[in-house]
């Protein structure tokens, strides 16, 4: 896993895999896993937020819009 931080937000909450929602502040540090789907080769990032059980999976372009690696 790598660390990243939130660099942009538009105010709309994100829904996590456990049906909770989060609206993190800019600067929030998160853990990130890279996931590659075997069938298609598509790459996604799975974002783990502090204090949350659920995760948010984002395609690379969406991840790059909202996060930067530390």
Description of each model-found segment:
Residues 7-63:
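Basic/aromatic-rich interaction segments and small domains that mediate binding to polyanionic partners
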């Amino acid at each position: 896993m790598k660390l990243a931080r939130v660099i942009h937000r538009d105010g709309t909450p994100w829904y996590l895999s456990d049906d909770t929602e989060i609206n993190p502040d800019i600067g929030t540090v998160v853990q990130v896993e890279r996931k590659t789907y075997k069938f298609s080769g598509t790459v996604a990032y799975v974002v783990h937020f502090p204090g949350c059980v659920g995760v948010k999976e984002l395609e690379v372009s969406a991840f790059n819009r909202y996060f930067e690696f530390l």
